[in-house]
């Protein structure tokens, strides 16, 4: 039917291994570089990684690289994957009747990042190095290097590990685990949009069923939004569903007075009326804020561990005896440039020298950007659980 256009065509790689030889180890090198422009958001090829060069809107889980010695790239370079990129999933111009519902959610549907969970990189005994240096084009370049990934563009990374890291170097941005993170606020969503109305309808229908104790564990609920019908699953505590690519979970407290709603990474708690429903205006406001915050790089429960002598991170062309230079000479022990990414419960061990340009170097992040007018945002909120 018409809802088939909502299917996300992703590349999936599960339970896969890449292993270098016991003696020489694995070496990977990118030899070319090109720039592509996407509405003032350039993307560069020349990516390199021990497992993959670039992953656009894909998922890799439970996979590993062992005996890695060296990864050299022109631009985005990482020990595991150089470029964790985003891509569009739906052409809104060809949706017909669904266009009205999706138009306000264009930011939700157009932008999906890649997911990497429970993956690992392990170096040879003497450690592995990651190096980003564009030798082809010194003007059109984006040199970003990280021990696990170079450029995590809206990527979601959870429970990944780097061990045996020796050095990360870059002509521009360098980080022990990731080079750069990004965000994409969905600020154009209107409170009266069909997307928000749809979410309000979904949440209230689920809460009413929970309030009336009508649901059994494992039961599938069908919610009709007119244009599309959505299936939701009850696991005994929460009702889970996916609306237009948004993961949503809804629960009700035992005394039925408080509803808890999860939209992506955001958690909403709001009081219920005696009939089990929530005031629509209050819910609209809460949902709108959650949607605005929905799209950002998230790195959670990840670890980078250096060799016994410690790992070095050099940004901006820095070296053993020189500091980095330039406005992008950024170096951080865990992330080079955290551009409003969400970093939670991460660890770094055996970091030695972190060196970049003046005021762009730090033990955890080299630079943290937070240019936001939203009162719910602060640096502690996005890097608070280090």
Predicted regions and their residues:
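Surface-exposed loop/turn motifs in large extracellular/passenger domains
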Residues: 1-386
């Amino acid at each position: 039917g018409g809802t088939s256009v909502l299917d996300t065509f992703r590349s999936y790689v599960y339970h896969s291994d890449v292993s270098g030889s016991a003696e020489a180890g694995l070496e990977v090198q990118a030899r070319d570089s090109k720039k592509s422009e996407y509405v003032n958001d350039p993307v560069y090829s020349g990516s390199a990684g021990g497992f993959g060069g670039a992953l656009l809107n894909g998922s890799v889980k439970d996979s590993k690289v062992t005996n890695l010695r060296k990864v050299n790239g022109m631009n985005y370079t990482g020990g595991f994957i150089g470029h964790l990129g985003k891509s569009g999933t739906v052409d809104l111009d060809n949706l017909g009747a669904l266009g009205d519902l999706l138009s306000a959610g264009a930011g939700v549907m157009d932008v999906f990042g890649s997911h990497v969970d429970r993956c690992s990189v392990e170096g040879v005994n003497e450690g592995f190095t990651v190096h980003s240096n564009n030798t082809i084009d010194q003007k059109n370049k984006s040199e970003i290097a990280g021990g696990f990934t170079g450029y995590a563009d809206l990527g979601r990374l959870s429970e990944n590990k780097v061990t045996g890291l020796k050095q990360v170097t870059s002509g521009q941005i360098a980080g022990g685990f990731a080079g750069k993170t990004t965000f994409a606020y969905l600020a154009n969503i209107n409170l009266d949009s069909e997307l928000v109305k749809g979410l309000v309808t979904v949440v209230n229908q689920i809460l009413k069923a929970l309030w009336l104790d009508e649901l059994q564990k494992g039961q599938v609920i069908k919610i009709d939004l007119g244009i599309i019908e959505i299936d939701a699953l009850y696991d005994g505590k929460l009702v889970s569903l996916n609306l237009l690519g948004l993961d949503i979970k809804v629960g009700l407290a035992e005394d039925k007075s408080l509803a808890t709603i999860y939209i992506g990474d955001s958690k909403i708690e709001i009081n219920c009326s005696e009939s089990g429903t929530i005031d629509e205006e209050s819910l609209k406001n809460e949902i709108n804020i959650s949607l605005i915050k929905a799209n950002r790089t998230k790195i959670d429960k990840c670890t980078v561990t250096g060799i016994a002598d410690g790992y070095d991170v050099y940004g901006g062309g820095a070296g053993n005896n020189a500091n980095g230079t330039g406005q992008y000479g950024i170096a951080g022990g865990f992330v080079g440039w955290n551009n409003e990414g969400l970093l939670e419960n991460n660890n770094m061990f055996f970091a030695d020298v972190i060196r970049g340009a003046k005021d762009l170097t730090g033990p955890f992040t080299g630079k943290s950007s937070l240019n936001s007018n939203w009162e719910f945002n602060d640096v502690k909120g996005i890097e608070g659980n280090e």
